[in-house]
Amino acid sequence: MNGFDAVLLVAVLLLTVVVVGAVLVGVRAVRGLAGTSRPDDPAFIAEKDRQEQSLAALRSAAEEANSTIDAAKSAAAAARTEAAAARAEAKAARAEARRVLDGARAEAEAILERVHKQAETEAEQLRTAARRSGEREAAVLAVTTRDQAAEVERRAVRMDDRERLHTEEVERLAERDRQLSAANAALEARESALAERDRELEQAEQRRRRELERVAGLTAEAARGELVEAIEAQAKREAALRVRDIEAEARSTGEERARHIVVDAIQRVASEQTAESVVSVLHLPGDEMKGRIIGREGRNIRTFESITGVNLIIDDTPEAVLLSCFDPVRREVGRLTLEKLVLDGRIHPHRIEEVHDLARQEVAQLCQRAAEDALVEVGITEIHPELVGLLGRLRYRTSYGQNVLKHLVESAHIAGIMAAELRLDVPTIKRCAFLHDIGKALTHEVEGSHAIVGADVARRYGESEDVVHAIEAHHNEVPPQTVEAVLTQASDACSGGRPGARRESLEAYVRRLERIEEIAGGKLGVERVFAMQAGREVRVMVRPDDVDDLSASMLARDVAKQIEEELTYPGQIRVTVVRESRVTEIAR
């Protein structure tokens, strides 16, 4: 029921009450008149007529009120009908509004979804364009960097060649000065000898004259005695000349014989010599593996270089990467590590550390096997196991570009051939020649020359004094006293002095890098040192408990200053100190 219905109902009720009240008043007035007046009284009759008229008027008013009430009821019913229709229309309007609102909301959501998808598409296009632009810029930068690195490398090679030519020219001039000095000394000695001979001839002429003067006054017996003495002196002189000729002939024959023995030994050995390289090539199953090796933002390649100390060069060469390091052991460990990672397919920092440990163990086994093969090739059976381990270290050690283990095998063969020609103890001399460079496996751990260190090691592990003396005397640090020591020297010189066996430029380069690592490794708190980029960068790994951030910067400055003071090198050397803290917890 709305407000209009309520007002209409109240009006009807009020009108009903008024009509009923008027009827009651009329009835009561009629009854009063009936009780107080007589029927034949004119006043009574007039009053009665007036009351009847009033009653009739009241009845007509009541009827009119009833009709009004009926009209009001009809109007109220019509109003209720209209209100119901209005409510139905309002309900339909609300339903229509709700339907329109739902449609608008669905349309808005669809528009929002389309706008969102379009925004995502445009964002993806922008990201793709940015990534392609970054890749193009990175490729251009890589090409520029590679060209600059190649140019720097070419300049370094030219500088090394120029330095080598300058060194050779200085050595030739020094050799020429020595030859001129020797020639001048020989001329002066010859002039002195000629002057002395002239004086001796003049003195002999004077003695002969005095002798003739004296003989002229001697008797026959005295002259005979003088003649006998002269003949004896002449015989002694001829005998001395004969002895001198025999000695000269023996010396000439001995030199010829020795030369024949050495040449025959070298010809019979004639081992091949391959120049040691500082770069290894690893072939990949496909170019997509290069991206996995690099890792996200270069994480894998940085971890690989910091753990192995080997430069990993990834360029446009199809299905291949380069590993560069001056240390052959490090380079071989890095090559095996990367090969195992590529075969396994799992390449991440933790896996790199695990595979690196396995590769180090495998390289140690390869060294042990190489030493055993060399012993079998030379023919040495009884030897201390510790010496076998030291010999295995020499598989990846070079001397002026010549592999030390191959040099020992070659020296042993040459010494054995020369000993057989001279009918000497072949096994002992081969053992001396094979062990003469054993000290090179410990020169980075023990102070002293490799000859003295090797002799001490051989003596400690039960080698004979002949072998020990040959080892310590093969560089004349101790004067050679036995034929074994002399033949060890000769075989060492024959193996190392052959054309193409050794290269001093590579050895100088390797020594410079080793000295750089020694300088940095001698500082307090340093754990590992790697010379990278052909010596142009030094990475120093420090222990975080011993070196803080301030000490790390001071350490880098000290290393750079000491390198500047002690070494001569082209260009500049960057010293990078890496301080890394690792905390590991196990969730159980």
Curated annotation (Swiss-Prot):
Subcellular location as annotated: Cell membrane
Class of this enzyme: hydrolase
Superkingdom in the source lineage: Bacteria
Entry keyword Nuclease: yes
HD domain segment(s): 404-497
Recorded GO CC terms: plasma membrane
Molecular function terms, GO-annotated: RNA binding; RNA endonuclease activity
Keyword annotations: Cell membrane, Endonuclease, Hydrolase, Membrane, Nuclease, RNA-binding, Transmembrane, Transmembrane helix
E.C. no: 3.1.-.-
Membrane-spanning residues: 7-27
InterPro entries reported in the protein's UniProt record: HD/PDEase_dom, HD_domain, HDIG_dom, KH_dom, KH_dom_type_1, KH_dom_type_1_sf, Ribonuclease_Y, RNase_Y_N
UniProt membrane topology term: Single-pass membrane protein
GO biological process: mRNA catabolic process
Residue ranges of domain KH in the record: 278-359
NCBIfam families reported in the protein's UniProt record: HDIG, RNase_Y
Annotated family: Belongs to the RNase Y family.
Role description: Endoribonuclease that initiates mRNA decay.
Protein name per the record: Ribonuclease Y
Gene designation: rny
